[in-house]
Amino acid sequence: IHDVWIEDGIAYSSNWKHGVYMIDVGNGVAGGSPSNPVAMSNYSYESGAHHATFPFKSKSTDKFYTVLGDEIFPQGIDVYTTNETAGFIHFVDFTDINNPEEVARYELPGHGSHNYWIENDILYVAMYTGGVRIVDISGELMGDLFRQGREIGHINTANPNGYIPNAAMTWGAQLYKGYVF
C-alpha cells in the first residue's frame, strides 16, 4: 500500500502492481466499517506503478472516476540529476464499480507524475521535472488529454541557477484559497 484516500467512508487504496482498491470503511454501502472493512471493487493496469488515487465526480457529466497516478523511475536514476521520470495519470470510469474502465490519460512526454489535486473539474498535477501542470478535465474524458490540448497552464519549477541546475523534482500540487502550493 502506498497512499490511501478516504472520502465519504470509502477508502481508495493505491497498491502499486495490484492497482487501486475501493474499500467500504464506514460508508455502509457494502456493509463495511472501520473495524470491519469490506472490499467493493478494484482496478489494475499493466505498468504496475500505481502510486496515488484521487476519487473524482465530474461536475459537468456526473460521472465518477478514480484518477490514478503512476510513479516510475528509470533503473539507476540519480535524484541529483535531471534524469527523466515516466508515468502518467489514468482516468478510470468507476460509475459502474463492477466494471471500471480506463477512458483517458494525461501524459506529459519525458516527465512522470507524482501527487495531484482536483477541484472544480481542474487537475493540478506535479510532474517531477515537468513542474506543475493545470489540466481542464471537464466534459467527456476520452483518449490522451495532453494531445487534446486540455492543459490550460503550467508552472516551470526548474531553475538553471538551482543547487542542482534544472533538477526540480516537483512532488506536489495542492490548491488552497486560489493558490497552488
Tell where the protein language model's regions lie, with residue ranges.
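Feature marking well-ordered beta-strand scaffolds used for ligand recognition
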Residues: 1-181
